């Protein structure tokens, strides 16, 4: 959940309280699709660096510099949230297309034609428009539930994410 890296840092600092060791904890989420981890690593769209330290941010930027990718430098909590927001948005697209597919069956429209027509809209894109039995993988189910849980912990209700989980 959001705030995990804060807890990790505190745990390490408590453990090292009497040692003269300097640590920096950063969040560096991955954005890999199931079955294409190597490709996704080598052809990433961006690198997200979440840190509370300019020193750690600079070190990670130097590590990633040879890849010539956009680097998004944010706080640790924002980096953790970016991961959830991305995965949950993709789950939303899948759930949406499944709902549209159900309606297409009722009205006699072809979901493949609908998806193809939608895919040319640059605001939508062609990814994640395939209707099916729902979203899966190792991240989407746990991340949608996690974001729903996080929102409730903070007294917020994410109706869209709750609908994605329900669909």
Spell out what each predicted region is.
Residues 1-167:
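Structural/interface elements that position substrates and couple domains in central-metabolism enzymes
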